[in-house]
Amino acid sequence: MGTKFLALGLSLCLVLSSFYQVSCQDEGTGSLSTLDLIEHEYQTSVNSLQGNEAVDQTETSGQKNSTVSDNNTISLSLSEEPALETLKESVDTSAELGAVTDEVDKPSSMLDHIELEFEAHINELKEAGSDGINKVEESKDDEEAARRHKMLEAIEREFEAAHAGFEQLKTDDSAQGLDDEQSAKRQSMLDEIERDFEAATKGLEQLKADDLTGINDEEHAAKRQKMLEEIEREFEEATKGLEELRHSTSSTDDEAQSAKRQNMLDEIEREFEAATSGLKELKINAHTVKDDVDDKEQDAKRQSMLDAIEREFEAVTESFKQLEDIADNKAEGDDESAKRQSMLDEIEREFEAATNSLKQLNLDDFSEGDDSAESARRNSMLEAIEREFEAATKGLEELKANDSTGDKDDDEHVARRKIMLEAIEREFEAATKGLEELKNESEQAENKRNSMLEAFEREFEAATNAKANGENSAKNPSTISTTVQKSSGGYNAGLEGLLKPADGVCGCFNKDKDGLQADTDSSINIAEILAEESKLQGSGTSRLTTSLNNLVDTHRKETSSKVGSVLGSSSSVTSTTSESAATSESIESLKQTLRKLRGLSARDLVNHPNFDAIIAAGTRYEVLSSASIGYISLLAKYKTVIKEGLEASQRVQIAQTRAKLLKETAMEKQRTVDSVFAAAKTTAQRGDALHIRIVAIKKLLAKLEAEKVDVDSKFTSLTTSLSELLKEASQAYEEYHEAVHKAKDEQAAEEFAVETTKRAEHIWVEFLSSLN
């Protein structure tokens, strides 16, 4: 165990020392003291681990006598009592020997999960540090740097809290003894997990070195992605090892170990809430820089950080489930156990619902929708998350009340548990405040968009009023309508450009000679609709145009009356003071003063620090000189519009850039669809050819089968005639053999007759001879 702690401490010190350099470049000297403190604490922990290794070995040798083997299952008797009392209890009751078997590995299992939390926090610190370096190089915004510094301090506090839990588990593990076989098995599994962590740490070091070099090309991005996937696989293998280590032990425990497991449960809950707060801060930070649509690399980096925190949520949820399984076997009353289990299930459901909502909010935040419907949806999701956290807080408060009334825990454990639960409540309150801040920022963004729209409306109204004041009073209403139509021509052109359908596979298709062809005739043409509507309306104006003309005429009359009154008063003043030399000198001095401003543009004039004094001087000059047109009053009206012109141009540029990006995305998707469609078309043609071949083969097979039927019938008839012919041939052969046999008999009779005749002839000759 000491070797494992030493290796882990050294790897963490290497990572922290590396991050020390990154944080120095990012945050300056603000966070040096905090990182030095963390590094010093870890060096102290490594030294203490080296000293405790000998103590672990001596205590292990002293407690080997309490080992009992039953069916290849090793049971260890571990307790906080002295060694003599433990030995007596192991001799008296064998049931108590198997009651605490899993407690040898459970704290170490929790220790391994806290180590996973360390690695996750280290990843988050490194990514936040590299993010800080890129942000400092790209922008010198003090507010963004302060927010990033605040987030890093919060993560450092979480890291210190996890370090305290690590020290507590180290102390608990040093007071326990292990059996030889079980210790060897655990040591081998822990060594394998350590190797996985070392490999992941080396990967992180390599990633950090690549980030410091400032390489941002595609090859570096692919290499980074590959290394991140490798690190993720290493962590998954370590998690599997932890699961195997957890299942290798039994499932019974005593009251003291139950209290320790409950402390581990509270620690994991605090880690979960701290990670939730970190995610909220990252989302707030992401929301403040959302308007920078050109910073794709920053968006990808933010997305990777959110994914890392979500993986940390999943790891904590797995630990939560493990501790819940342990809580199933607690030696307490059935009613109390069932009640506690139901409360834990409720809290887990609340956390899972909050995690799902955070994932959905993450996806919505990665997309770039800015309309009011999207803002309302985000607000509703934030309110739902807030309700989930409030429900979880209520469950924790009820759990705290039940723990305060329990009789099995001592005063020290109760006090420590209350302190931990109060810390959880503070974390929940911080998360709620973060949600409220995010909601307020969303409302501010919505108000800003509304103010932008109002500014556009005021600008359009001011332009219309200026045009109306400069024209003749006998202007035709149709001319006003034409002016309004011209002023909105750019917007209509933009709408026509957006409503124009893209050619490709996604459009409507008509059959043509060459196959499928996009049907663009069904697109919406605003010009044709407007022309048709104007033809239907004829020469008369519509209701909205009439109301607009009435509004313009009323405004013209009021303006004319006001100008007439001002001119009348100025004429009277001029008539009363025209003969005064002081008035002439004032007019001349004002004219000379105003002529000095000829080199300034309207925008420079509005941004001038003495703009109000210049407007006052110009107004006085127009009054004294009896000017026919009040240019200064019109210029004062344009003040707000000109000041907002720069912001409007920036917003227009952002909108154009966003439209360009969306167009590129749509074109890319269209190209993807075209390629997929071409592949589908090729596959369809190949399938058709195969179908034709199959049909031809089927026809040929049917023809061959028909021919086979004919051959079979012919063969049957031939075999029938052949059998008859065989019978006839056999009968003919029998008749032939009978005829041959009969001929042979006749021939034998003939030969006998011939011989008899010859003998008779010989006898007759001899008889005649004897007569002589």
Swiss-Prot record:
Biased composition (Polar residues): 466-487
Protein location: Endoplasmic reticulum lumen
Annotated spans, Disordered: 49-72, 465-487, 555-585
Low complexity bias (residue ranges): 561-585
S-adenosyl-L-methionine in keyword set: no
Induction field: Induced by NAI1.
Tissue distribution: Expressed in roots. Detected in shoot apex.
Tagged with keyword Transcription regulation: no
Lineage, top ranks: Eukaryota, Viridiplantae, Streptophyta, Embryophyta, Tracheophyta
Coiled-coil annotated residue ranges, if any: 187-476, 688-748
Name assigned to this protein: TSA1-like protein
Region (10 X approximate EFE repeat): 98-472
One Gene Ontology CC term in the entry: ER body
First and last residues of every EFE repeat repeat: 98-138, 139-176, 177-213, 214-251, 252-292, 293-330, 331-368, 369-407, 408-439, 440-472
Oligomeric and partner information: Has no interaction with PYK10 and is not part of the PYK10 complex. Interacts directly or indirectly with MEB1 and MEB2.
Miscellaneous notes: 'Nai' means 'nothing' in Japanese. Homologous proteins are found only in Brassicales plants.
Function: Responsible for the ER body formation. Regulates the number and shape of the ER bodies and the accumulation of PYK10 in ER bodies, but is not involved in the expression of PYK10.
Position of the signal peptide: 1-24
Organism: Arabidopsis thaliana
Phenotype of the disrupted gene, per the record: Loss of ER bodies accumulation in all parts of the seedling and alteration of PYK10 localization.
GO terms (BP aspect): ER body organization
